[in-house]
């Protein structure tokens, strides 16, 4: 009698186990594949704050200072290759740069503590090759001066060198609302 109960339970539990395992695998796959949407809101600062100056190297080891971009609206983004939202927002940053690049606007992407060869290899794997300026904050001094507490963090700086907007987390930079904020600053 005990053997029959065991066999009945065993045969009943195997299909239930298979169904449960399948549902678990399916939900794990769905959770892995679904990514939250990127935001688009840039938070205005209550009043403009002067952007801290800096000088950093690009991938060609040439120095760039924030003051080199005075007179332009600057979208400045702190990022890293290991940061998934940073990687997801990179194509929209390039599209924005291509749309507005010129005398009044530029994009600066400041990489956090990674070496140039690694970043160069990473950018070669992207669907879109970034043509905006990529700088390296190898010791985090610049990110500390901007009080960056998480990646990605983005600042929108006006033509006078004042921080006007800030965003923490991934953004869809070519969203019409972001473009509107940039155009307003470009017209000031």
Label the model's feature ranges:
Residues 112:
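Active-site loop/turn elements of alpha/beta-hydrolase fold enzymes
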Residues 48, 53-74:
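A short beta-strand-turn-helix
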Residues 108, 122-160:
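Short, internal strand/loop/helix patches
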Residues 32, 156-188:
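Thiol-/selenol-based redox modules, centered on thioredoxin-like
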Residues 1-53, 176, 188:
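N-terminal targeting signals for export/organelle localization
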Residues 117-120:
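Acidic helix N-cap motif at the loop->helix transition within catalytic regions
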Residues 70, 78-95:
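Conserved redox-active cysteine motifs that mediate thiol-disulfide chemistry
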